[in-house]
Curated annotation (Swiss-Prot):
Recorded name of the encoding gene: incM
Subunit description: Interacts with host CCDC146. In host cells infected with C.trachomatis incM, CCDC146 is recruited to the periphery of the pathogen-containing vacuole but recruitment is not dependent on incM.
Transmembrane segments: 37-57, 59-79, 253-273, 275-295
Lineage, broadest ranks: Bacteria, Pseudomonadati, Chlamydiota, Chlamydiia, Chlamydiales
Superkingdom of the organism of origin: Bacteria
Vacuolar side: 58, 274
Family note: Belongs to the chlamydial CPn_0065/CT_288/TC_0561 family.
Function: Interferes with host cell cytokinesis, centrosome positioning and Golgi distribution, and contributes to the morphology and stability of the pathogen-containing vacuole. May exert its effects by acting directly or indirectly on host microtubules.
Location relative to the cell: Host vacuole, Host pathogen-containing vacuole, Host pathogen-containing vacuole membrane; Host vacuole, Host pathogen-containing vacuole, Host pathogen-containing vacuole lumen; Secreted
Segments in the Cytoplasmic topological domain: 1-36, 80-252, 296-563
GO CC annotations on file: extracellular region; host cell membrane; pathogen-containing vacuole lumen; pathogen-containing vacuole membrane
Protein name per its UniProtKB record: Inclusion membrane protein M
Species of the source: Chlamydia trachomatis serovar D (strain ATCC VR-885 / DSM 19411 / UW-3/Cx)
Topology of the protein relative to the lipid bilayer: Multi-pass membrane protein
Length: 563
């Protein structure tokens, strides 16, 4: 997972500026360190000297030499304290910049790519990209009014064309961030078509992780014109500032010396000297800061700073960096835009494909359930039919034709039967049975061989003794009668059959539509794979252009340092 510390400073070109003029401590860090140690030692000695002066005056010792020593000690302490404060401030800024460099993603985004490769779940994948996009959005690729004025002085007649490219860079970067934020929304359809573990989508996210990580790691340190700070001192202004700072320091020393000479040597006046020295030191410090601020924001300093940049870096290096930055962001923006268009165009097909696939799965489950219920109901009908046949077959069979004829006449003359349809079926069955018996007796059997028992059962569907069914009529309901005599299905079986036919028709229609949609979805999947190859090319191009920009930034700083 990609985590960033809370309240982490922004990675932006302004954090890694082009230093137009390095100070003495930057050029000679070892000497500056020795001076800081000396200042700390002087501050400690000055405090000891002041304490010694107070004790000596209280004891009635030599006041004037001790007062002079105390004044010098106080002044040395003040200067040492000011030096320590400035050094600590600069050391803190350098430490902050080092922390920023350490917090940048590793080369080629190894940790993020490894994470995505080992854990490809949906939420973690998008959370990782979201964290990287949030960090990328902190890069500020805009130029404020003072820097624009400085660039206008540096570039001269080329300013208008280069400024147009700079504005396009800012606009492309903003649009690119917007597309990155909307990617998850664009890929809702493809995620449903090939959920989460799909190689094309995983590869695209992995490539985009590499691109964003490289941008976060290298773009802030390859800012070019975005790394320039207008409110810095030019060479001439820095010289003037140094002269004024030394003059004010000497003035404070002279003031403290005057106080020591003209004030009487007593304990209260030593306190006055100390307070006055402190006040003069604070006033000197504030005046120095005010002079520096005025010099940094003066038009004269801006013109001199522009001349210094023209002499050292020159407009060609800055223009080249603008060109490569424009090429980098234009290529990334166009690649992401093409990817978004492809994903948005394919989204309805993928969503419809996923919905239809889910519908087919649901209909298949319904079909299996209904088919099982239908077969079970058929088995129950067959068991009931066999049971009813056995019940009808158990009734006594008539011994002669006269009894049969009597029984037939009784059945034919029965007008009070509650089930006329059943009676009609019985009558038809009896007629068919008599006809069959007559034909069978005349062709195959003699009267002696005729057995009433053999020809007493009519078999329309099963072994039914229809001549005796009238006796069990009262024991069968309508559904059982139909089941027994007409090979009819029960009401439950009929319902299952109707539902099964309906689901079968819906399933066939869905499968037919799915076969057509599958081709379109495969075409869209191919286009998505093409977008993956485009992102791979964009990743290589991004790495190449960022390396070029980094080398140009180092060249610009080298030219500034060796001026």
């Amino acid at each position: 997972m990609v985590y960033f510390r809370a309240h982490q400073p922004r990675h932006t070109p302004k954090t890694f500026p082009l230093e137009v003029h390095h100070s003495f401590s930057d050029k000679h860090p070892q000497i500056a360190k020795a001076m800081r140690i000396t200042g700390i030692a002087l501050a400690a000695l000055s405090l000891l000297a002041v304490v010694a002066c107070v004790i000596a005056v209280s004891a009635g010792g030599a006041a004037i030499p001790l007062a002079v020593i105390s004044g010098i000690a106080v002044m040395s302490g003040l200067l040492s304290a000011a030096t320590i404060i400035c050094s600590a401030k600069k050391a803190l800024a350098q430490r902050k910049q080092k922390q920023l460099e350490e917090s940048l993603p590793l080369d080629n985004a190894t940790e993020h790519v490894s994470y995505l490769t080992s854990d490809t779940s949906y939420f973690n994948q998008w959370e990782s990209l979201g964290a990287l996009n949030k960090q990328l959005s902190q890069i500020d690729l805009t130029i404020q009014a003072p820097e624009k004025k400085l660039l206008k002085e540096v570039l001269g007649s080329r300013y208008d064309s280069i400024n147009h490219s700079i504005e396009e860079i800012s606009d492309r970067f903003t649009k690119m961030l917007s597309l990155l934020r909307l990617r998850e929304h664009f890929y809702r359809g493809e995620e449903r078509y090939a959920p989460y573990l799909s190689p094309p989508l995983l590869n695209k996210n992995r490539l985009l992780t590499q691109i964003t990580s490289n941008m976060i790691r290298m773009l802030p340190k390859s800012g070019g014109v975005f790394s320039l700070k207008a409110n810095t001192l030019s060479h001439a202004s820095r010289t003037l500032y140094t002269v004024l700072k030394v003059a004010l320091s000497l003035g404070v020393l002279a003031g403290v010396a005057a106080l020591i000479i003209f004030l009487p040597p007593s304990l209260p006046f030593i306190a006055v000297i100390g307070v006055s020295s402190l006040a003069l030191g604070m006033a000197s410090f504030l005046m120095i800061r005010g002079i520096k601020y005025l010099l940094e924001h003066s038009p004269l300093n801006r013109k001199q700073l522009a001349k210094d940049i023209q002499k050292t870096i020159g407009p060609d290096v800055l223009a080249s960096m603008v060109h490569y930055q424009h090429q980098l962001l234009s290529h990334l923006h166009e690649t992401l835009l093409d990817e978004a268009i492809t994903a948005r165009w394919s989204e309805p097909f993928f969503i419809e494909h996923a919905n239809l696939k889910a519908k087919i799965e649901d209909l298949t489950k319904q079909y299996d359930i209904l088919n099982a219920a239908f077969n079970k109901s058929l088995q129950q009908d067959e068991a009931l039919r066999s049971q009813l046949e056995k019940r009808a077959y158990l009734f006594p069979i008539p011994n002669n034709d006269e009894n049969a004829k009597t029984k037939e006449s009784q059945l034919l003359d029965s007008e009070n039967d509650s089930n006329s349809e059943f009676q009609e079926i019985i009558n038809k069955g009896l007629e068919a049975a008599n006809k069959r018996r007559a034909d069978a007796k005349s062709k195959f059997y003699t009267e002696d061989e005729t057995s009433d028992k053999i020809f007493s059962i009519w078999k329309p569907t099963k072994n039914l003794a229809l001549e005796d069914l009238w006796r069990v009529h009262e024991a069968c309901n309508e559904e059982q009668q139909a089941l027994l005599l007409e090979d009819y299905m029960s009401y439950k079986t009929s319902e299952c059959q109707a539902a099964l036919q309906k689901v079968s028709q819906e399933l066939k229609a869905a499968q037919k539509s799915f076969a057509v949609l599958e081709k379109h979805a495969l075409d869209r999947s191919y286009e998505s794979s093409v977008a993956t190859m485009d992102l791979a090319r964009a990743n290589q191009e991004t790495h190449r252009l960022l390396n070029i920009l980094s080398e140009l930034q180092q060249l610009a700083q080298y030219l500034l340092d060796n001026h």
